[in-house]
C-alpha cells in the first residue's frame, strides 16, 4: 500500500468464488418476462415518399393493444419526421425494414429556428419518436430505427454529431433531437429492435412507472457525443435485459432530479456493453434507490461501473448491487466519484449500501473511489472483486468493507 498526492493507492487482487441467481437480486417490483409482440391493426408498405403523415395517421387510428406494422414495399426504408405514439398503441418494424429520421433540422424544431443550432439552452428539438402519458405502448422489432446522426443535414452544413462537437468547443449546448423520448408513461416496452445513429440520447424514460427494454440493440460510434443508450430519469420499475449497447456516451445512465420523483427499482440483467462511458448512475443523484446490475459483460467502455455526481446534483444513493460483472479493455472498471465535475453547489452526497460482488476486470485499469466529505464517507462493500495485478486503486473518503 502506498500514498500518492494525498490519496491512498492500492494494488490488489481478490479471488472470485461462486455465482448466484440473477432473479434473486432483481429490483423491479414487477414480474417481468420476455415481451410478446402485439398483433397489427394495419400494415404499411415502404415507398420512396416521406411517410410522416401516413405513419402518424395509422397510429392515431389504431386500436389500443395493437401495433402499426411497417413492412417492405418498393423499398425497405420509411423516411419520417417526428412521430407520436398514442396510449396503448405500438409500432412494429419488420425484419430488414428501417424507420429513418429525415435529415432536416427544421422538421424537429419546437420553436422557429430552434433546432440544429448551438446555444445556452439545448432544448430546441423534438424527439424523433415521443410517447407522453401512455400506458402499454411500445416499439417492437426486429427492424431498425436510424437517427442519421452522422449524415449532413439538408438545411445545414453539418451533421448532428458535428454540431455536438462544435458545441463542446464553444462551451455551449447543441440542439439535437433524441431518438425516443417517453414521458409520464406506464409499462412501455422496447423489444427486439435495433436503434442506431441517434443525434442525441437514444432512449429516455422520464417520470414514468414501468419500462422494459428486452433484446434491444443500440449501436452508435464511440465518437458521437452525448449519445447515451438508455436513461431512466426520475422513474421506477425499470428492466433492461438481454440487450447489447454501444454508444458515444453512457451505455446506461440512471438519473434522479431535484424536485421530481425518486428513481428506484431498477434491474439491469444479462446485458453486453461495447464502447461507451459505462454503466452509470448520475450525475443527477437526488434520490436513487434499489438498483441491481447482474450478469453484465463490458468490452471497450471508458468506465465500467460508475456512480458520478457533484455539488450541484448530489443527493441520496442507496441500495445499489453489482454482481457477476466481467470487464475487458475498460480503463476505469469501478468509479465512485462525488466530484465528477467541479460545479458550484451545496449538496452533500449521501451514498451508502453499495455492493460489488463477483466483479472481474481482465485487463489493467484504475479503480477510483473518491468521496468529497471526510465526515460522511461513502459506504461500499466489495466481495470477490478481481483485478489484474498491475491495476491500481485510488481511495479517498470511502469506507470499503469486505
Swiss-Prot record:
Q: Does the keyword Translocase apply?
A: no
| Residue pairs linked by disulfide bridges in the UniProt entry | 41-62, 115-125
User: Could you name the domain of life of the organism this protein comes from?
Assistant: Bacteria
User: Which of the seven top EC classes does this enzyme belong to?
Assistant: hydrolase
Q: Note the subunit structure.
A: Monomer.
Function (record text): Involved in maceration and soft-rotting of plant tissue.
* Family recorded in the similarity comment: Belongs to the glycosyl hydrolase 28 family.
> Could you identify this protein by its name?
Endo-polygalacturonase
Gene expressing this chain: pehA
